Curated annotation (Swiss-Prot):
Interacts with the cullin cul-5. Keywords: Nucleus, Ubl conjugation pathway. Disulfide bonds: none annotated. Disruption phenotype: Viable but with decreased survival. Adults display abnormal locomotor behavior and mutant females produce less offspring with wild-type males. Third instar larvae display a reduced response to touch. No gross morphological defects. Ubiquitous, but likely imbalanced, RNAi-mediated knockdown is lethal. RNAi-mediated knockdown in embryo eye primordial cells, produces small, rough eyes,. RNAi-mediated knockdown in the middle wing patch, results in a significant reduction in the L3-L4 distance due to a decrease in cell number, whereas cell size is unaffected. This is DCN1-like protein 1. Residues 9-46 form the UBA-like domain. SUPFAM superfamilies: UBA-like.
Length: 288
């Protein structure tokens, strides 16, 4: 309250707290969002309290961490704890929402959260319970409609999906995550996955991962705007050439199938995400 220089604002905060039985943080936030108009702020609060609620019970968050933490390591939630966490959220491991949570928690390792990642992540989201996180998830997913935020989410996924200490992502894992993050965004998704499984069969480098988003965003249905002299990874050059040689760009073909469904191979590869919550793997990889 001392941060408020205006006595009028301080009085409105006290009045708001008395009326709504909320805390000071919520009162200040709601009044600020409504230009310090008391009647408007109180009406909007009662219509949508979840939006304005800003009081956090940090002890409650710490208790949640204790519920899921690894018995052998008190400073992290391991794979089994994450599975328990996802079960409480009614989420499957290969759900995009799981990846969004990891993104918001700034998780560094797949299938686990450090104590700081979990507690700070919950605090940053302004939530202190599973039910509140459930309510928040659709809002977080909508953030991906912003191109800048989606790009950040997409780049985060590379670091999250690769094994610690490795420079690239195992091919099957890369395909699995591409099917999650680029579904509905890359018209050649299924054909890309088919090409990789038939012709590449190696790990995916950061450069290829990052630039595929630019390719997916800008390429037209006929790939007629592809610049083979541009600074594209060789793998994407090879993909375009392969599509042209194998008539994947014929008028009667359906390159947009990636928008509609996942290929059976891609769907199968997503099992790797679920299995990653059960075991950890170390693999020697070649990069492309």
């Amino acid at each position: 309250m001392n941060k408020l220089k205006s006595s009028t604002h301080r009085d409105k905060v006290k009045k708001f707290i008395s009326l709504t039985h909320t805390g000071e943080q919520t009162a200040i936030f709601c009044l600020q969002q409504n230009d310090w108009k008391f009647e408007l702020a109180s009406d909007n609060y009662f219509q949508n309290p979840e939006y304005y609620y800003r009081e956090l019970d940090r002890k409650r968050i710490e208790q949640l961490f204790m519920r899921y933490r690894d018995p052998s390591d008190p400073l992290k939630i391991g794979s089994q704890g994450v599975i328990h966490f996802l079960e409480d959220l009614d989420l499957k491991p290969d759900s995009k929402l799981v990846l969004i949570i990891a993104w918001k928690f700034h998780a560094e390792v797949q299938c686990e959260f450090s104590r700081d990642e979990f507690i700070n992540g919950m605090c940053d989201l302004g939530i202190d319970s599973i039910d509140k996180l459930k309510t928040k998830l659709p809002i977080l997913e909508q953030e991906l409609n912003d191109a800048g935020k989606f790009k950040d989410f997409y780049h985060f996924t590379f670091n999250y999906a690769k094994d610690p200490g490795q420079k690239g992502i195992d091919l099957e894992m890369a395909i699995a995550y591409w099917c999650i993050v680029l579904s509905g965004r890359f018209k050649f998704l299924d054909i890309w996955c088919q090409f990789l499984e038939e012709k590449h069969k190696r790990a995916i480098s950061r450069d290829t991962w990052n630039l595929l988003l630019d390719f997916a965003t800008n390429i037209d249905d006929r790939m007629s705007n592809y610049d083979s002299e541009g600074a594209w990874p060789v793998l994407i050059d090879d993909f375009v050439e392969w599509c042209q040689e194998n008539d994947h760009l014929k008028e009667d073909s359906s390159p947009a199938s990636g928008y509609q469904q996942q290929s059976s191979a891609s769907s199968s590869s997503q099992k790797n995400i679920s299995s990653a919550y059960q075991t950890s793997h170390s693999t020697n990889m070649n990069y492309g």
